[in-house]
Curated annotation (Swiss-Prot):
Cited PROSITE patterns: C5_MTASE_1 (PS00094), C5_MTASE_2 (PS00095), SAM_MT_C5 (PS51679)
Lineage of origin: Bacteria, Pseudomonadati, Pseudomonadota, Gammaproteobacteria, Enterobacterales
The name this protein goes by in its record: Type II methyltransferase M.Eco47II
Catalytic residue list: C153
Domain SAM-dependent MTase C5-type positions: 81-414
GO BP term, example: regulation of DNA-templated transcription
Signal sequence coordinates: none
Role played: A methylase that recognizes the double-stranded sequence 5'-GGNCC-3', methylates C-? on both strands, and protects the DNA from cleavage by both the Eco47I and Eco47II endonucleases.
Family: Belongs to the class I-like SAM-binding methyltransferase superfamily. C5-methyltransferase family.
The protein's Enzyme Commission number: 2.1.1.37
Keyword annotations of the record: DNA-binding, Methyltransferase, Restriction system, S-adenosyl-L-methionine, Transferase
NCBIfam families: dcm
Catalyses which reaction(s): a 2'-deoxycytidine in DNA + S-adenosyl-L-methionine = a 5-methyl-2'-deoxycytidine in DNA + S-adenosyl-L-homocysteine + H(+)
Species this chain originates from: Escherichia coli
Enzyme class name: transferase
Length: 417
């Protein structure tokens, strides 16, 4: 609470902070400065650009940040609600929903390593391992408040017609919809990649929305949430879908979670401070081959392949050097003063490099976990590659918590009627 209050008093923001808040590049801000669209101030000591809070208030994203109601919205409800989750992975969504006050009755996951992770950390959870299509959900009919899950984005076969529930058979969304049909929960909560918005020219999402409506639910318009606004030190975006059963929907409005009032950085993730009460613990991590380490040692914090000498650029990029485009993920070293880039299933892939800001090495398993806001005591099972994959695929815990609290508020409204 004290940190939140201090953040509310902040009156000046750096170039990188404003870039993150507004969702534009630092180069775009420099162009706006030159054009007079958003003129920066200059620090007398180092001549660095900064911006006054008053300058940002006309921007919608900044208003969202400055109007934070985080402490009020994250108060724990006295009511106990239940959740059944599909595609649970390593528990990012489950842990966030648990923090929000939702009690798990079943989690389904097909990956054996992820199931071991769930059982290791929460022996009391009912973890059902295996293909979701083989799970019978009818025993849970009318006993579950929330059905949650992040079904993978898959195309449907249209053949020139509007699709119904049965037409999506064979996809993982069908299994989510089948679970909804069998369980009849009060609320549906689904998450997916931002790309679902435009997948198959928008038809995939339109079909999902239509089927949710056909199942007897009132859908609130899906929204892309930026994790950096929800106390997650990572530039990650997720599409969130929320719907309430028709017989409960009359006069009910869903309020999306408001932002935390500060953009947290990689330093907040890995060092003692506002997010964690200690530095990140040591853990296993991938290693670079000798030549790759030599090349990445030349990249400054926040830099990438264009910061290398031209001959080294050509050596590292090979044919990609001549293809043009930014390719800003290649030979990328993270910065302490910015949120991490989106984590992938491995930290040392050439297209999506995630090099430590000071040491020339990939991020470790525990560093990965902190960036996804898992607690240090959350243990991941399996070989190192499986641990990275579980963490990289997870929903950030704090994002799930924020959404979970908003769903709990929705259920509270339903209960009060």
């Amino acid at each position: 609470m004290l940190a939140w209050l201090l953040n509310m008093l902040k009156e000046e923001f750096s170039l990188s902070e404003v870039a993150d808040i507004l969702g534009v590049s630092k180069e775009t801000l420099r162009r706006w400065d030159t054009a007079g669209k958003l003129v920066s101030q200059r620090n007398d000591e180092n001549n660095y650009r900064f911006y006054k809070k008053e300058q940002l208030k006309n921007f919608e994203q900044a208003q969202f940040l400055f109007k934070s109601q985080w402490p009020d919205e994250t108060k724990i409800s006295n009511n106990v609600y239940t959740v059944l989750e599909l595609f649970a992975g390593a528990g990012g969504m489950a842990l966030g929903l648990e923090k929000a006050g939702l009690k798990s009755v079943l989690l389904n996951e097909i990956d054996s390593h992820a199931c071991k992770t769930l059982r290791k950390n929460r022996p009391e959870w009912n973890v059902v391992e295996g293909d979701v299509s083989q799970v019978d959900f009818t025993p849970y009919r009318n006993t579950v408040d929330v059905l949650a899950g992040g079904f993978p984005c898959q195309a449907f076969s249209y053949a020139g017609k509007k699709l119904g529930f049965e037409d999506t058979r064979g996809t993982l969304f069908f299994e989510f919809a089948r679970a909804a049909k069998e369980i009849n929960p009060k609320v549906l909560l689904a998450e997916n990649v931002r790309g679902l918005l435009n997948h198959d020219a928008g038809r995939t999402l339109e079909t999902i929305k239509n089927i949710i409506t056909d199942l007897g639910y009132t859908l609130f318009e899906p929204r892309v949430l930026k994790a950096i606004f929800y106390k997650v030190p990572q530039k990650r975006e997720r599409l969130i879908i929320v719907a309430v059963r028709n017989d409960l929907a009359d006069g009910i409005d869903y309020e999306w979670p408001s932002s935390y009032n500060k953009i947290l950085t990689l330093k907040d993730a890995l060092k003692k401070g506002e997010l964690y009460d200690s530095d990140v613990p040591e853990s296993e991590g991938q290693k670079y081959p000798k030549r790759k380490a030599e090349i990445l040692s030349m990249v400054p914090p926040g830099g990438y392949w264009r910061d290398l000498p031209e001959d080294i650029q050509k050596e590292y990029m090979l044919k990609s050097f001549y293809l043009g485009g930014g390719k800003t993920g290649m030979a990328r070293r993270l910065s302490w003063d910015e949120p991490s880039l989106t984590l992938t299933c491995a930290p040392a892939q050439k297209q999506t490099e995630r090099c430590h800001p000071e040491e020339t090495r990939p991020l470790t398993v525990r560093e990965y976990a902190r960036i996804q806001t898992f607690p240090d005591e959350w243990v991941f099972e399996g070989p190192m590659s499986a641990k990275y994959k579980q963490i990289g695929n997870a929903v950030p815990v704090n994002l799930s918590f924020a959404v979970g609290k908003s769903v709990v508020h929705l259920l509270d409204k339903i209960n009060k009627r």
